[in-house]
Amino acid sequence: MEKHAFIKTFDRLMGELNIKEIVTDAHVQIASLMHPEKGRYKDQGVVHSLDIWHAAKNLTKRLHAAGTTSGQSQILVCLKDVVNHFWFSCQKACNREEFMCIWRGVLHHVCGEHELFLGRCLHAPLDEETANKEVIPPGSAAHEALSQIVLNRRWLKDVEKFLTFRSTSELESFQNHILMYAGKRFSFSPPVYEARTLLAALDTTIITTEQCM
């Protein structure tokens, strides 16, 4: 259903707008449509970016699951640091090579290693509280589990799509606003639903304009 809706909407917009980039969550079928070599829209030159917030949320879930496993609770101590480092890596890097160089550094950071042979952590000097934070011993079960998550090939195969540092949060906020006019508990004919969606769009535009004034 999402694939059909995406195709219908995207085809319509392509005829009305000069689309340079589209941002979605990690939907397999949509990713297939936007594949630069095999996808339906491969010849359109549209950049496909993935929502950074959903990626960070997914990373948080996997870290939490690993941290609740026996012998790996130290992952929970550094969970926030690892997720923040992912945000930083995506914002700082311009390509896959730069991202991996920065991203892999977190495996040393959580061990308390901030000065390395080929470089150092990019953060400012740590305050006393942070410097005294519990670290993960290299080679421990927790560190091995963290390494498997950080270096997971399946998760990193689309890393370039995160480097544009995009988010769909405003769209999701608008979707919630639509529910005020067209709640899911009620049924509407297509013309009525379209009219209610347009009202939601007008309302959102007015609110946004007032906030900017």
Where in the sequence are the language-model features?
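Phosphate/oxyanion-binding active-site loops and adjacent basic polyanion-contact surfaces
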Residues: 1-6
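Acidic/histidine-rich catalytic cores and adjacent linkers
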Residues: 7-17, 21-39, 43, 53, ...
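Inter-helix linker motif
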Residues: 42-67
